[in-house]
């Protein structure tokens, strides 16, 4: 196991991890969009896919402005969260119950990302990566907004439809 000796090493590790997470998510969101039966939910997943692609580009900008180099790694946490969503798609018929499950799976992803970006902002600030932190904060705010939209969808329509379908 490679030891991370400095806060700089930790920042690079965490940024590499979330980069992997975002790349994995770009593939998963397209599947979630196809699996959703509610047109608004499907569209929300497509919109977040575009946003996620922009977030990957933003990480590239962070790398450039901070003068760091990402490590090749796989975010196993995101892999597991995506697998949970994939299992729902395989096990539940398309409809309101699956939609409710997809919302829950997507919120787990958002909460992971919110935690990751929040930590990166705090560590980046300690390291003096002012421009990089600005970029990371922009992504953090997007993730929070997406989580809020998912909550609103669940409260407004998704979970109610799922309960009446049961």
Set out the residue ranges of the language-model regions.
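Amphipathic alpha-helical hairpins
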Residues: 1-166
